[in-house]
């Protein structure tokens, strides 16, 4: 369940007369409460495969998560995957899975960019209006420096997102760029959400104020599909192997 390695799905498939018999669990599966089919990755002696399976054939348990996003736990023990359900050709499963992961990271980074910008705007407005010692707190050097760091983080994420998006659209091999973007996205979300709450003081954690919702979503996107540390570890392995 705590697996961040795309090359080694924890769900395994054993060849049977009707296809493959699966064993394992998927956690944090998204929108299975409304989906008619689930895209499942699993590994066999022949490599990684992807299959579309009808959700009414699966054991799905809804999870009560802090962000209230509709995540589910998926028990795949004993599920039979027919060969007709497999969507990849032999030997191409891992390539397709990495492509899906790349799209997911690009989408996450795009959402993160919007969240960071909104947190920056809320912070700029609040520190311009909130007064202490008869002057806006945004005029204090420490406050303005931390807000400036939020802006720098936003620009860092924006630049790397544009670069990765261009490489993806051009069909380039961008595995390392995607890992780098995942690493940067998590770090930027972590730093800006904490900075925004810090500069807001007590209002930063008030559920009546919109910043709380952005910070909660930022934490979700920081750690979903692996955190920054796992992305950095995978990137360092690729660099060590000259990939």
Region roles according to the model:
Residues 1-15:
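A gly/ser-rich beta-alpha-beta helix-loop segment of oxidoreductase catalytic cores
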Residues 10-12, 19, 28:
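Short, surface-exposed charged micro-motifs
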Residues 15-20, 102-243:
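Alpha-helical interface subdomain recognition
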Residues 20, 38, 49, 70-74:
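Short beta-strand micro-motifs in enzyme catalytic cores
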Residues 25-58:
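A short core secondary-structure module
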Residues 28-29, 54-89:
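Flexible, small-/acidic-enriched active-site or ligand-binding loops
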Residues 40, 51, 74-76, 116, ...:
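Residue-level signal for inorganic ion chemistry
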Residues 75, 94-107:
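Helix-biased detector of long, well-ordered alpha-helical tracts
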């Amino acid at each position: 369940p705590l697996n961040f390695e795309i090359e080694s799905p924890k769900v395994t498939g054993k060849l049977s007369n009707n296809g493959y018999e699966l064993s394992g669990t998927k956690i944090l599966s998204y929108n299975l409460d409304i989906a008619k089919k689930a895209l499942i990755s699993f590994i066999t002696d022949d490599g990684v495969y992807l299959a579309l399976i009808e959700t009414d054939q699966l054991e799905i348990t809804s999870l009560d998560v802090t962000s209230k996003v509709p995540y589910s736990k998926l028990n795949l023990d004993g599920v039979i995957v027919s060969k007709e359900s497999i969507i990849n050709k032999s030997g191409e499963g891992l390539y397709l899975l990495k492509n899906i992961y790349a799209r997911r990271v690009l989408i996450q980074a795009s959402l993160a960019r919007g969240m960071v910008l909104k947190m920056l705007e809320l912070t700029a407005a609040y520190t311009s209006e909130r007064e202490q010692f008869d002057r806006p707190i945004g005029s204090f050097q420490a406050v303005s420096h931390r807000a400036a760091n939020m802006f720098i983080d936003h620009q860092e994420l924006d630049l790397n997102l544009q670069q990765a998006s261009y490489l993806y659209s051009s069909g380039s091999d961008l595995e390392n760029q995607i890992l780098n973007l995942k690493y940067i996205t998590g770090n930027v979300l972590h730093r800006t959400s904490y900075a925004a709450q810090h500069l807001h003081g007590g209002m930063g954690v008030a559920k009546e104020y919109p910043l709380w919702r952005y910070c909660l979503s930022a934490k979700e996107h920081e750690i979903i599909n692996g955190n920054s540390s796992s992305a950095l570890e995978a990137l360092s392995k690729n660099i060590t192997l000259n990939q």
